């Protein structure tokens, strides 16, 4: 079916890369619209933000 074309067996975990922020330059989201698109088509997608200082 068209509504579940993105369904996966395991969840998708999105984590930002080079920057320690979820946005490039504080403006553009790192994962853009991908998490919303995936979840709207039956995929389990999670976005995680890592802090630069885990003791902070």
Curated annotation (Swiss-Prot):
Give the matching InterPro entries.
AB_hydrolase_fold
Q: Relate the activity to temperature as described in the entry.
A: Thermostable.
Q: GO MF terms on file?
A: triacylglycerol lipase activity
Q: Name one GO biological process term.
A: lipid catabolic process
Catalysed transformations (reactions): a triacylglycerol + H2O = a diacylglycerol + a fatty acid + H(+)
This protein's superkingdom? Bacteria
> Which controlled-vocabulary keywords does the entry list?
Hydrolase, Lipid degradation, Lipid metabolism
What EC number(s) has UniProt assigned to this enzyme? 3.1.1.3
Q: Write out the function statement from the record.
A: This thermostable and solvent-tolerant lipase is rather nonspecific. It can synthesize both primary and secondary alcohol esters. Simple triglycerides of short and middle chain fatty acids (C<13) are the preferred substrates.
Q: Which family does it belong to?
A: Belongs to the AB hydrolase superfamily. Pseudomonas lipase family.
Q: Please identify the protein, giving its name as recorded.
A: Lipase, thermostable
């Amino acid at each position: 079916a068209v509504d579940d074309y993105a369904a996966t067996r395991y969840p998708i975990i999105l984590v930002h890369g080079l920057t320690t922020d979820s946005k490039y330059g504080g403006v553009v989201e790192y994962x853009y619209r991908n998490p919303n698109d995936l979840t709207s088509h039956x995929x389990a997608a999670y976005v995680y933000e890592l802090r630069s200082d885990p003791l902070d």
